[in-house]
Regions:
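C-terminal motif of bacterial Sec signal peptides marking the signal peptidase cleavage site
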Residues: 20-23
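A short glycine-rich, Lys/Arg-flanked "PGG" loop and its adjoining helix->strand segment in the class I
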Residues: 107-108, 174-189
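Class I SAM-dependent methyltransferase SAM/SAH-binding core
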Residues: 93-151
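Core SAM-dependent methyltransferase catalytic element
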Residues: 228-245
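A short acidic, Gly/Pro-enriched loop at the edge of an enzyme's catalytic core
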Residues: 151-161
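Conserved class I S-adenosyl-L-methionine
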Residues: 189-216
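Class I SAM-dependent transferase core
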Residues: 25-93
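Hydrophobic beta-strand segment of the Class I
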Residues: 92, 161-162
């Protein structure tokens, strides 16, 4: 796909058929249509008074969409991971890992001396993740069942926590971010990757987009400071935050 081009009719059909983005079980259900056709799980908390409603979470029944071939061009996962300062020996977390699309790519980057916690709120997603881990022999990937307000991660253990198209689905973002802040090392970083809410040409439902200003404002209120912003991906922001202690 050319970065600057709109999706073809065929591509739009893919979005309509299988809605998600790789996230917190949590893959969102991004699509041009206003009608979702993939199973979703309603946000577990009432709408927050922050100008938006948490998006619904895609069910594990639509998990095949997370590994669609088109995702390589649309989201450029390897370029994204190369830009977020991962290194051998790190302990990292893929929050809302789903079937492990990013976690399995992170595993060889941190290497045998590192580890990748792959968290998700759906046990069924973790079952599929464990199968993928076994097939790939990714012994340093550790599946973790998380919750709306609990990360399931050890305290002060994480160098980099990654949330790809996940944050906008959190039903209790303040509580979850507080738990995630506790899981980060003092110099740890939180990386948000979200579809650009500023760009109407991004063919994603509005509830599955965020403007950079909105994300930065909400993270600041939760005690995180923006330290880096990258905009080279076709459709998504990369926002890197440090916890304020």
């Amino acid at each position: 796909m050319n970065v600057g081009s709109r999706p073809s009719r065929a591509r739009a059909a893919v979005f309509l058929l299988a809605l998600a983005a790789c996230g917190c079980s949590r893959a969102p259900s991004p699509t041009v249509s206003t009608v979702s056709t993939a199973p979703t799980i309603a946000a577990s908390a009432p709408p927050l008074d922050r100008g938006r409603t948490p998006a619904e979470t895609m069910s594990y029944l639509g998990a095949d969409w997370l590994t669609r071939p088109e995702r390589i061009a649309e989201e450029q996962p390897d370029r994204m991971l190369a830009a977020i300062h991962l290194a051998p020996g790190m302990t990292v977390a893929d929050i809302g890992a789903g079937v492990g699309y990013h976690a399995l790519r992170m595993a060889p980057i941190v290497g045998a001396a590192g580890r990748v916690y792959a968290t998700d709120v759906q046990p069924e997603m973790l079952t599929m993740l464990r199968e993928a881990v076994a097939q790939r022999g990714a012994a340093n990937v550790i599946p973790v069942l998380s919750g709306d307000a609990a990360t399931g991660l050890p305290e002060a253990s994480i160098d980099v926590a990654l949330m790809v198209d996940v944050y906008h689905e959190l039903g209790q973002p303040e509580r979850f971010l507080a738990a995630l802040k506790a899981a980060l090392k003092p110099e740890g970083r939180l990386v948000l990757v979200e579809f650009r809410g500023e760009d109407p040409s991004v063919p994603i439902k509005e509830e599955h987009k965020m403007t950079a200003e909105q994300a930065i404002r909400e993270l600041a209120a939760a005690g995180f400071a923006l330290v880096e912003r990258q905009e080279f991906l076709p459709w998504q922001h990369i926002l890197i935050f440090a916890p304020r202690r």
